[in-house]
Amino acid sequence: MKKLSLSLMLNVSLALMLALSLIYPQSVAVNFVAAWAILATVICVVAGGVGVYATEYVLERYGRELPPESLAVKIVTSLFLQPVPWRRRAAALVVVVATFISLVAAGWIFTALIYLVVSLFFRLIRKACRQRLEGREPCQG
């Protein structure tokens, strides 16, 4: 319950700051949104790297049979194999777009572009690792 309330408070404060930064592009709320974007960028880069390494480790060591007691398996399942409801995906897309628009409107263009590229890259990494773990090879162009 405590984790849920903390997550709810963070999401509400982010939504409020996003709304304020879209209404007032030169306000302090933009700094909060920029700090959020930089933090999210770092998290996506680290999670993507750790996830890819753990996926390769799990596939090399265990193959397709995933023992639940391994730390690498827990990392892989929490990052890549948990189903994401469509409402959460839609909300995440709205947050990414609103963050991008807010940062561009305030003049943080480089930060906005890096945030957008890294978040899309993390989604691609997640999809490719999920396909590898399910036994399908990603599309090869």
Curated annotation (Swiss-Prot):
Report the locations given in the UniProt record. Host cell inner membrane
Its source organism is Escherichia phage P2 (Bacteriophage P2)
Keyword terms? Cytolysis, Host cell inner membrane, Host cell lysis by virus, Host cell membrane, Host membrane, Membrane, Transmembrane, Transmembrane helix, Viral release from host cell
Query: InterPro entries of this UniProt entry?
Result: LysA-like
Predominant subcellular localization, coarse grouping: host cell
Protein name as annotated: Putative antiholin
Primary role: Involved in lysis inhibition. Interacts with and inhibits the holin thereby delaying the host cell lysis timing.
Q: Keyword Coiled coil: yes or no?
A: no
Q: Which GO terms describe its biological process?
A: killing of cells of another organism
Question: An example Gene Ontology cellular component term from the record?
Answer: host cell plasma membrane
Membrane topology (UniProt):
Multi-pass membrane protein
**Transmembrane parts of this sequence:** 4-24, 32-52, 94-114
